Swiss-Prot record:
Lineage: Eukaryota, Metazoa, Chordata, Craniata, Vertebrata
Protein's UniProt name: Fibroblast growth factor 3
SUPFAM superfamilies documented for this protein: Cytokine
Domain of life: Eukaryota
Organism: Xenopus laevis (African clawed frog)
InterPro entries linked to this entry: Fibroblast_GF_fam, IL1/FGF
Keywords from the named record: Developmental protein, Differentiation, Glycoprotein, Growth factor, Mitogen, Signal
Signal peptide location: 1-21
Keyword Glycoprotein applies: yes
Record family assignment: Belongs to the heparin-binding growth factors family.
Classification via Pfam families: FGF (PF00167)
Known glycosylation sites: 83
PROSITE patterns xrefs: HBGF_FGF (PS00247)
Record GO terms (molecular function): fibroblast growth factor receptor binding; growth factor activity
GO CC, one annotated term: extracellular space
Name of the encoding gene: fgf3
Length: 237
């Protein structure tokens, strides 16, 4: 009789453990972000230590137009030129803004295929390839506009001969002046109109242009075809 009671108690104590183990085995697995391996959903949610809040980082780019407070849209041209345009539906003002890190974005011209970049002299240019000069710190201004500052370059005051604190660094901002021309980064401030940009969603005409660019080879070639030089020459040439 004692042996029967011992066997019964051992069966009761082991039963829930076996059941719980089977439930863990049956729990669905999901693909991890890398390698295509299956992993626990909690591990997938905590990957990178960010949780689900920043799952959009590194994802699909946002198609936007950057409208400067000086009333110009930022353009990235095929020839590497950066400027502003008053034209509402210029195809070279349609941009892809992609988050590459927390608060860091890369800005690419959808039609030119070039990246917005700032060199060590504070000049804006359109780079054919992605490099560290193409990374910008994106911040939301208190007026509702965004600012874009070079991640790589900034003005660091020297410790000697200055009243500024050593930590008072000055960022170099992307800017378009009142004539549609880019200003050098170290000459701008985040409160100036030339450095304030409003990301605008594309309208119907912009969406039609994007669709044609991806589906119509003739239209795409007409956009990518270099413009012919003007017949008139400048004076002194």
């Amino acid at each position: 009789m004692v042996i029967i009671w011992i066997l019964l108690l051992s069966f009761i104590s082991c039963g829930p453990q076996v059941s719980w183990a089977k439930r863990l085995e049956r729990e669905p697995k999901y693909p991890c972000s890398r390698g295509g391996k299956l992993c626990d959903p909690r591990q997938r949610r905590d990957a990178g230590g960010r949780g689900g809040v920043y799952e959009h980082l590194g994802g699909a780019p946002r198609n936007r137009k950057l409208y400067c407070a000086t009333k110009y849209h930022l353009q990235i041209h095929l020839n590497g030129k950066i400027n502003g345009t008053l034209e509402k539906n210029s195809v070279f003002s349609i941009l892809e803004i992609t988050a590459v890190d927390v608060g860091i974005v890369a800005i690419k011209g959808l039609f030119s295929g070039r990246y917005l970049a700032m060199n060590q002299r504070g000049r804006l240019y359109a780079s054919e390839t992605y490099n560290p000069e193409c990374e910008f710190v994106e911040r939301i201004h208190e007026l509702g506009y965004n600012t874009y500052a070079s991640r790589l370059y900034r003005t660091v005051p020297s410790g000697a001969g200055t009243k500024r604190k050593a930590s008072a660094e000055r960022l170099w901002y992307v800017s378009i002046n009142g004539k549609g021309r880019p200003r050098r980064g170290f000459k701008t401030r985040r409160t100036q109109k030339s450095s304030l940009f409003l990301p605008r969603v594309l309208d119907n005409k912009d969406h039609d242009a994007v669709r044609l660019f991806h589906t119509n080879a003739v239209y795409r070639e007409s956009i990518l075809k270099p413009s012919k030089p003007s017949g008139r020459q400048r004076r002194g040439q």
